[in-house]
Amino acid sequence: MILLAAMVMTGCQKQKDKEAKPLTEGNAVYYWRTDLRLDSTERAFLQQYHINKVYCRYFDVVMNDDGTEPKPNATITFSDSLPDSIEIIPTVYITEDCMHKPHPDLAEKIVKRIVQMNETNDIRNVREIQIDCDYTSKSRKTYYDFLEEVKSQLSTLHYQLSTTIRLHQLSMEAPPVDYGALMIYNTGDPRKWQERNPILDYRDVYPYLKRLDNYSLPLAAAYPVFQWVRDIQGVRVEHTVEAEEILRVKNAMEQERKDLSRAIITYHLDKDNINRYKPETYEEIYHH
């Protein structure tokens, strides 16, 4: 009986942890180009699907040429602006090798750079930043310590902090952030492209479904709408995920964890991606 009570209490605590800082329900997109410039199709998409958040990649962080220190790379320029009703979430992609050892001032530099970019470009509707990193079990501790430092830097700004979560990272302890954006794409091995779609295949997602319900972090769900074009031995190969496959995976994820339908993100905002799928497909992807 004591063991049973302990198990019940543990389960309740996990549920409370997931609900401690609930995600705001809504629709979002990633913006991953190096110049913020929207055409009429992209603006219409934001309005039609009631997009209230744009996760905008501000810059990457990579190791410098001699491999000693991280440096910013591929910084975005702002030739345009988003509608005032949309919250912009500065997003920074950090290569995993930057987390092979601690860099004590990295968190401070990143936050200061984001704040400076916001001020320079008169970007005011910011309440959160997101860090994207494909951390592994070996780099996890360094990355989580780094996230704690970022949170400390953000405390005076009263910003939230989120991070991307890849499917393989569901087996690890949850990171110290307010919520995670679960990346439900790039799930396969590109070397086996003739057998399965490396962008998204239900068979690659299936083994991770059982880990969803016990993951103790609020999660948004990010789905792919992009195309991957590669040259393989002189042959142009295009990878596009069928709408039916996206929806099959979405339904399976939400059956295992119902709150995954609360906050939906598509990757990424682009005219070609918008035209790749029918409006009814986007309606179903963004259905709560």
Short names for language-model regions:
Residues 222, 226-228, 232-288:
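Substrate-binding cleft of secreted/luminal carbohydrate-active enzymes
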Residues 9-11:
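C-terminal motif of bacterial Sec signal peptides marking the signal peptidase cleavage site
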Residues 37-64, 120-122, 126:
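Catalytic domains of carbohydrate-active enzymes, especially glycoside hydrolases
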Residues 53-55, 130, 181, 265:
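Conserved beta-strand positions in the central sheet of alpha/beta enzyme cores
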Residues 20-32, 60-182:
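Chitinase-like catalytic core of GlcNAc-active glycosidases
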Residues 13-19:
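Bacterial lipoprotein signal-peptidase II cleavage site
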Residues 141, 148-232:
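Substrate-binding surface in catalytic domains of secreted glycosidases
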Residues 35-47, 103-120, 169, 242-255:
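Short, acidic/polar
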